[in-house]
From Swiss-Prot:
Its main location: nucleus. This is H/ACA ribonucleoprotein complex subunit 1. Residues 1-64, 157-237 are annotated as: Disordered. Keywords: Nucleus, Repeat, Ribonucleoprotein, Ribosome biogenesis, RNA-binding, rRNA processing. Residues 1-59, 172-237 have a biased composition (Gly residues). Disruption phenotype: RNAi-mediated knockdown in female germline cells results in a cyst differentiation defect that prevents progression from the 8-cell cyst stage and oocyte differentiation. Residues 166-236 are annotated as: RGG-box 2. One of its GO terms (molecular function) is box H/ACA snoRNA binding.
Length: 237
């Protein structure tokens, strides 16, 4: 091998769920490229098990009935021993939120939420030894107010006023910003000594390593594949 020739950089990061990072090539004095970040899953919106979060807590123990309950809505009909309840309040219940009678006796949990944001119903999975034929039409069902989310969480955000400008900062040499949950990668990375950094990949930890890192991996949705790695570091003579 000849000492006068520095070795070239590494390959680009691949597209995919995890977003593999491209390693920078090793040369005499050139550091390997950093790992491309994996793209996260897209956040869920609206109803249908996307919005509102699942469950009332992770691995929570049964703490008994809540201090108070408020009306959620009225029982409308049953389907395979599940209840369908027309919701009468604006706030949105958690999935798996416990449902009670007025005397705080638990009868089941929220299973599905369906309809529009302003007009929706829920299905209730009944507890063991509780049967749908024991409920009367239009019977009130109740919920712990601590298991509700404000409706504003599910409404579109108001547009920004015209003329509002985003602040601009000029950081030389900064790596490309990681894309959002479904967005494209950030601008071109500045890179350190040696080759220039590749484009930043969509994901959390993409970015160039020292001495010409490879591009970050593609994000979960529509992220760009990582760019080719920069040239290796300076060769020794």
């Amino acid at each position: 091998m000849g000492f006068g020739k520095p070795r070239g950089g590494g390959g680009g990061g691949g597209r995919g769920f995890g977003g593999g990072g491209g390693g920078g090539g090793r040369g005499f004095g050139g550091g390997g490229g950093g790992r491309g970040g994996g793209g996260g899953r897209g956040g869920g919106g609206g109803f249908g098990r996307g919005g509102g979060g699942r469950g009332g807590g992770r691995g929570a123990f049964d703490t008994g009935p809540p201090e108070r309950v408020i009306p959620l809505g009225n029982y409308v009909y049953s389907c395979q021993n599940d209840l369908v309840c027309k919701v009468d309040i604006q706030d949105v219940p958690y999935f798996n939120a416990p449902i009670f009678l007025e005397n705080k006796e638990q009868v089941g949990k929220i299973d599905e939420i369906f309809g529009t944001v302003r007009d929706y119903s829920v299905s209730i999975k009944l507890s063991d030894n509780v049967y749908a034929n024991s409920f009367k039409p239009n019977q009130k069902l109740f919920i712990d107010p601590g298991k509700l989310l404000p409706i504003a969480r599910f409404l579109p955000k108001p547009p920004q006023p015209k003329g509002a400008k985003k602040a601009f900062t000029n950081n030389r040499g900064g790596g490309g910003g990681g894309g959002g949950f479904g967005g494209r990668g950030g601008g071109r990375g500045g890179g350190g000594r040696g080759g220039g950094g590749g484009r930043g990949g969509g994901g959390f930890r993409g970015g160039a390593g020292r001495n010409g890192g490879g591009g970050g991996g593609g994000g979960f949705n529509r992220g760009r594949g990582g760019g080719g790695g920069g040239g290796g570091g300076r060769g020794r003579w």
